[in-house]
Amino acid sequence: MYQISSSSKDELKRLVARASRAAEYCSHNLVLVVLEPEVRVSLDKDSQIEDVELINVSKSLSQRLVCLSANERIKRLDVEFEEVAEKCSENSWLTKLDLLFEPSLKADPILLLKWLSKSRPVVAIWPGQIYEKTLVYAEPGSEDYRTYSLQELKDIQVVNACNGVIK
């Protein structure tokens, strides 16, 4: 298994802190962190970055949505997502965002994150990759496949920790 070193974790925290400072001056106080898949898995298993609490959004949100009908899930997704986020400290990073891409919920994950970041700073670990100038989730042809041009995301800070670049 790939292990993320403590020096890499420190560098990641520095990159995110820098992007968070820049996000304070944007219309959305949102930082998306893009990691190599192996690093993301390691981070999820290890789940320890000093002074950072990793929040499993899919787990927390699914516990709130499971007792609702399919239509109620669609209607209440934004409210339930906000309630999950409200319980987070300012040193929390949202991870495991995959449930937000569930086609039956008919949601746009970026719009949900933007909406949430209007009222509070949000750091989220993107569950996909960056290919050229596009943020991607899933594979083409998959029902939950999504792409977002980085040009469209001008008002969001994107940390590409795959090569240490901040957009």
Please place each PLM-identified region on the residue numbering.
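Extended, compositionally biased accessory segments flanking or bridging domains
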Residues: 1-86, 134-149, 156-167
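A general structural motif
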Residues: 28, 89-91, 119
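Structural motif
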Residues: 32, 91-95, 123
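Conserved P-loop NTPase "ATPase switch" module shared by AAA+ and STAND
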Residues: 87-105
